[in-house]
Amino acid sequence: ECGIAECELLTADLVAAENRLLTLVQRANSHHDICVVTRLQLTLYTTMDRSDRAVDVFLDWLRRDGTVWSNHPTRDDVMREYERIWELLGNRQIEDLVHLPLITDPVVLDTMDVFTEIVTPALIFDEHLASLVVCRLVTLSLEHGNCDGSCFAYVWIAMFAGPRFDNYKDGFRFGQLGCNLVETRGLARYKARTYVSFGANVSPWAKHVSSGRDLVRRAVDAAYRIGDLTFAAYSRVQLVSMCLASGDSLAEVQTEAENGLAFGKRTSFGLIIQFSGAEVGLVRTLRGLTPNFGCMDDSEYSEADAERVFARNPNLATAEFWYWTRKLQARYFAGDHVAAIHASLNAQRLLWTSGP
């Protein structure tokens, strides 16, 4: 039944997947079955632009084992978990963690899977919740050993360590550790998530942006091969950003953006449709393919329609941030500085959604 639900999810039959999972969550008895159903629900609600519902499911899952978390933890909550990382690390070098034994306890492995799946919707929902989840993933790895989810966790703590904890140097080392685990220990299940997170959010701040772009391309390929729906979509969005930053041909960037939009539509992934729609609009207007240079409106995209969608659905706040950023860029290059400033102010109020 879980396999059928996953197939329904991958083929964008989201209503059927939701109904099946709601039935299965009532029937699941073992820790493993509960974790599998929960993980699929988290993927489903992320795809459905229901990060709030995903967080509710996650917190309910935690409560089953007697753990109570707030959906809006404080910075102090996060700092306690972050400091626990360094207590557990002790005198070891970050690079030495690549040699930790692999986790064999099925309970811990299932727990890591659920925590890994909640990271994305948690980031959309509350920045402190996302930080707390990532820190817990790392502490679980330090306590029990490495697994597929550890690769992703180490890269995400790299993303948080600098902006949120003012520890950029060690953050980058953790990011490299995550990638090394994929490549040297064969922990490839979350390869796409690890590569896109490092390539788009860690590497560009330490190396030339093109090195990150190439890693994001590998993430796209890996996501398709392993059927990682969520990060196949996110990787495509990030690839367009990286290609723009690398100065690639706008014709090539447009192809990448249109491929991402088509993927979002095929999978009914509303968040990605909004991300990619704005990317396509920006590239088209930069190429002079829209009726008015600097305006993303054409026969296939409407800025007004996008803004109405965002006004109706606060779960699309991350996509709205990207929209206003793309609109800012479009207006700036057209010399419409008043409209660019207006777009920048709208983007600024949503800056918290952009990640660490």
Positions of predicted regions on the chain:
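TPR/TPR-like alpha-solenoid signature
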Residues: 2, 39, 116, 135, ...
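Residue at a conserved register position within TPR or TPR-like alpha-solenoid repeats
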Residues: 8, 38-45, 121-122, 154, ...
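Alpha-solenoid helical repeat scaffolds
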Residues: 22, 52, 56-59, 135-138, ...
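Residue register of alpha-helical TPR repeats
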Residues: 36-39, 113, 152-153, 193-195, ...
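TPR-repeat structural position
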Residues: 14, 51, 127-128, 147, ...
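Eukaryotic all-alpha helical interaction scaffolds
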Residues: 8, 25-28, 45, 65, ...
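Amphipathic helix-loop-helix modules that constitute alpha-helical solenoid scaffolds
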Residues: 46-132, 244-326, 330-335, 352-356
